A protein has these predicted regions:
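Hydrophobic alpha-helix immediately C-terminal to the catalytic Tyr-X-X-X-Lys motif of short-chain
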Residues: 172, 176, 180, 210, ...
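C-terminal substrate-binding subdomain of Rossmann-fold SDR/epimerase-dehydratase oxidoreductases
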Residues: 9-11, 23, 36, 65-68, ...
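Short aromatic-enriched loop/helix-cap "lid" or pocket-rim segments at secondary-structure transitions
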Residues: 48-51, 148-151, 201-204, 235, ...
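N-terminal Rossmann-like NAD(P)+-binding domain of SDR-like oxidoreductases, especially those catalyzing
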Residues: 1-196, 329, 334-355
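Residue-level recognition of oxygen-bearing side chains
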Residues: 72, 103, 110, 202-206, ...
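The catalytic Tyr-centered alpha-helix of NAD(P)H-dependent dehydrogenases
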Residues: 162-169, 199, 203, 207, ...
Length: 356
């Protein structure tokens, strides 16, 4: 039986964050007949300025609130008759999870459970849930799989082996989603993605952090020797993959989304330095002089890589960005959007980067 899903009313959680906002900026104009309700707590990494291009769209509504607030979530399900949940909301910065793990458990585990149970209650009719009319899509991370050696890649069969409070909380939420599918027949899909980059990312993450510091010729902190390897995925390619999985993915399946762009952290920093120097008309190599190697992060996974073959083969997903073109465009975006950067570089940002 086909499980093609046609969303009518979509609850998007965390839609003011980096990935959720990029998803909404692409989907709201793409699907004018679909209603999108964005529930976001507007924590430090959520920025409503990002959503200004769609804030007056007839098919878009913003709700300020917490996914762990059961009464609020239930009220939204009662009011909006959601057919679909696209669950982005999460605490996601590993360093912060080490400092405050309970905040990650509350949002990533308790918040996910709250949403799952509201969906279960709202979508159950005479003891069953229509597997085509409804869908709960949980967006997750490759960090739940732990670390790789020099070879190999994560895929949908990789065992879970989380090493940080962040990845453990996301692993817990993944298991809850599958448990609701197995126990209650909730129609679910899950995706695990590699590291994202692109416009509107909060500048605590590696790429925007290094762009802003290289611009200012400030010290560029690199963990350990910079040998850790990440697989980089442009956020717009990720958003398009999510759209594809949301509509055509098979119920209870997991899809891995990756960029096939593995790079050592130090190599990424070197490239960013040179791109910033070039864009600002400085001698290439100037920003590299600010690289400072700092004590490695506890439990720092050595290497991530994603095999996205299932998504590419079954659903025909392709990427529109190479890492080289995407990184160049990302540098240009951050250098051109000073007002957006200033809006997020408040005390919460300064407190964050001072610890890095």
């Amino acid at each position: 039986m086909s499980t093609h899903h046609s969303p009518r009313v979509v609850l998007v959680t965390g839609g003011a964050g980096f990935i959720g906002a990029n998803f909404l900026l692409r989907m709201v104009p793409r699907y004018p007949d679909v209603q999108f309700v964005n529930l976001d707590a507007l924590t430090y990494a959520g920025n409503p300025m990002t959503l200004q291009p769609i804030e007056d769209a007839e098919n878009y509504t913003f709700v300020h609130g917490d996914i762990a607030d059961g009464a609020l979530v239930q009220r939204l399900f009662d009011e909006h008759d959601f057919s679909t949940v696209a669950h982005f909301a999460a605490e996601s910065h590993v360093d912060r999870s080490i400092l405050d793990p309970l905040a990650f458990v509350r949002t990533n585990v308790v918040g996910t459970a709250t949403l799952l149970d509201a969906a279960r209650r709202a979508w159950t009719t005479e003891g069953a849930i229509d597997p085509v009319a409804f869908r709960f899509y949980h967006i997750s991370t490759d960090e739940v799989f732990g670390t790789l050696g020099d070879t190999g890649a994560f895929d949908e069969t990789t065992p879970y082996d989380p090493h940080s409070p962040y990845s453990a909380s996301k692993a817990g939420s993944d298991h809850l989603v599958r448990a609701y599918a197995d126990t209650y027949g909730l129609p679910v899909v899950i995706s695990n993605c590699s590291n994202n980059y692109g416009p509107f990312q909060f500048p605590e993450k590696l790429i925007p952090l290094m762009i802003t510091k290289a611009r200012d010729l400030a010290p560029l902190p690199v963990y350990g020797a910079g040998e850790n390897v990440r697989d980089w995925l442009h956020v717009e390619d990720h958003a398009d993959a999510i759209d594809l999985i949301l509509r055509d993915g098979r119920n209870s399946e997991t899809y891995c989304i990756g960029g096939r762009a593995e790079r050592r952290n130090l190599d990424v920093v070197h490239t960013l330095c040179d791109l910033v120097d070039e864009a600002l008309g400085r001698e290439v190599g100037t920003a590299r002089e600010q690289i400072t190697f700092v004590k490695d992060r506890p439990g720092h996974d050595f290497r991530y890589a994603i095999d996205a073959g299932k998504l590419e083969t079954e659903l025909g997903w392709t990427r529109n960005h190479t890492f080289e073109s995407g990184l160049r465009a990302t540098v240009a975006w951050y250098l051109a959007n000073e007002s957006w950067l200033q809006a997020v570089m408040d005390q919460s940002y300064r407190d964050c980067v001072q610890t890095q």
